């Protein structure tokens, strides 16, 4: 009887205990692009570099490993009728006296214990249309040739099928037929190997249409890694809609045997969006972190990305792929988060709703000419400046004063919205004044907030961490900015 009472108590406890959020998943897979196709590849595959150098690609594989990448996905193994592997179907895109880029990458991946998805594109180029029987048959021939060359490699994990069709509003019959035909051939050529697709169109999916789920369930593919389209900016503020899309797609995948992965885009645009005349450049780390948090909370089992090589860079001195300086900084900021950087970890917790605040220790919060209760009400905004949780501070100098109940050491974490396209930025200087029991303020520190260069199209939540190691009773935070500011919450730690 005692045992039964204990079980009943334990089950009751589980019913009332707060849910524990999953740890935000890191990026463990990435596409790798071998060819310069247009201006989008300006930094990832520079025209003035030898993009067929096997030494470079081996170095990039090791770099991917250092970033925590386990899965490498070839974007394409051929382009414009030339192959980056020892093909008998078409001419070579590299010097035949050297190791091919594809061979170098898959061999180095095997050495590093990584897994590779081989691409069967392009039959012609990045505009391959699988509704054309000649294109489909050519991709099948490429698959057969690649299976013979690399099917026995330790690193060969499966196939990436570049069937970049649109999910929405409902996946077409033609797309389903094309995918399933490729999957059938792949499983016949390489039994036990996985097949992967990564469709776009999350922003226009009709989840309320019963045919939408039916079409997904008809697919015979092993893995779908959905493009989150945040980098592509298919809508002005994609994050609020994206969170719901992940949840809805998870419900569908729970009724299938298809693995549910996320493809979180790491890039932004140097000029216009979705243009072949605009280079891909690194997105700000807070934007990327929000994408990872949304995909994790949406239930994906793994996050892969387009893409780390040429967007993030760890070997810029020898092989300078990526936007100068910015790609290096992006890689270091990502690794800082992986290694527990406090500011980014606090942002992560705030994004997942698991960041607590010691509001009981705050006696009062004040702002000039306004109500400051919003700063400690526990209500946070999303990546949309029209969300009512964001409170506006005009350009110039603004102050927030936090009075503690008693003198203590600690830290304050704040969230600001960065939305350059709406004229909302972050302060270029933050002044921290502290006071003890006597109420006399003195300047304790000045923080400079980095202004990310690739803010033309994106909106993200910018973290600000203020720490003090001496016992203080009041903190005054001054912001100097040339644009209006949006702030939603203040956390006392």
Each language-model region and where it sits:
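Substrate-binding cleft of secreted/luminal carbohydrate-active enzymes
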Residues: 228-235, 258-344
């Amino acid at each position: 009887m005692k045992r039964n009472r204990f079980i009943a108590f334990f089950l009751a406890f589980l019913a009332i205990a707060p849910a524990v959020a999953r740890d935000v998943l890191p990026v463990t897979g990435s596409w790798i692009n071998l060819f310069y196709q247009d201006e989008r590849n300006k930094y990832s595959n520079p025209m003035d570099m030898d993009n067929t150098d096997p030494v470079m690609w081996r170095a990039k594989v090791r770099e991917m490993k250092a970033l925590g990448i386990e899965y490498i996905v070839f974007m394409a193994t051929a382009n414009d009728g030339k192959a980056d592997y020892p093909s008998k179907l078409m001419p070579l895109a590299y010097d035949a006296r050297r190791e091919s880029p594809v061979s170098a990458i898959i061999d180095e991946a095997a050495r590093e214990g990584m897994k590779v998805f081989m691409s069967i594109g392009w039959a012609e180029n990045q505009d391959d249309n699988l509704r054309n029987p000649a294109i489909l048959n050519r991709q099948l021939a490429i698959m057969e040739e690649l299976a013979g060359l690399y099917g026995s490699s330790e690193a060969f994990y499966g196939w990436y099928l570049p069937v970049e069709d649109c999910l929405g509003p409902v996946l077409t019959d033609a797309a389903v037929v094309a995918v399933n035909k490729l999957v059938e051939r792949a499983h016949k050529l390489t039994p036990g190997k996985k097949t992967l697709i990564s469709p776009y169109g999350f922003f226009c999916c009709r989840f309320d249409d019963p045919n939408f789920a039916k079409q997904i369930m008809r697919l015979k593919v092993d893995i779908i890694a959905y493009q989150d389209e945040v980098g592509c900016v298919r809508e002005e503020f994609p994050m609020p809609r994206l969170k719901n899309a992940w949840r809805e797609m998870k419900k569908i995948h729970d009724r299938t045997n298809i693995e549910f992965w996320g493809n979180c885009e790491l890039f932004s645009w140097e000029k216009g969006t979705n243009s072949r005349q605009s280079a891909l450049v690194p997105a700000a780390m807070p934007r990327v972190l929000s994408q990872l948090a949304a995909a994790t909370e949406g239930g994906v089992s793994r996050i892969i990305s387009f893409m780390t090589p040429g967007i993030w860079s760890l070997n810029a001195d020898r092989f300078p792929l990526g936007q100068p300086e910015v790609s290096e900084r992006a890689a270091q900021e990502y690794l800082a988060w992986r290694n527990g950087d406090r500011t980014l970890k606090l942002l992560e917790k705030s994004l997942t709703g698991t960041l607590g605040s010691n509001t009981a220790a705050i006696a009062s919060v004040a702002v000039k000419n306004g109500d400051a209760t919003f700063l400690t009400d526990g209500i946070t905004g999303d990546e949309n400046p029209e969300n009512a949780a964001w409170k506006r501070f005009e350009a110039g100098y603004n102050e927030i004063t936090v009075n503690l109940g008693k003198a203590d050491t600690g830290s304050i974490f704040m969230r600001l919205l960065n939305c350059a396209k709406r004229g909302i930025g972050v302060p270029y200087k933050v002044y921290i004044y502290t006071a003890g029991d006597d109420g006399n303020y003195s300047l304790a520190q000045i923080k400079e907030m980095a202004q990310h260069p690739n803010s033309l199209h994106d909106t993200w939540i910018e973290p600000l961490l203020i720490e003090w190691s001496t016992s203080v009773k009041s903190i005054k935070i001054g912001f100097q900015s040339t644009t209006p500011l949006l702030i939603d919450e203040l956390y006392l730690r």
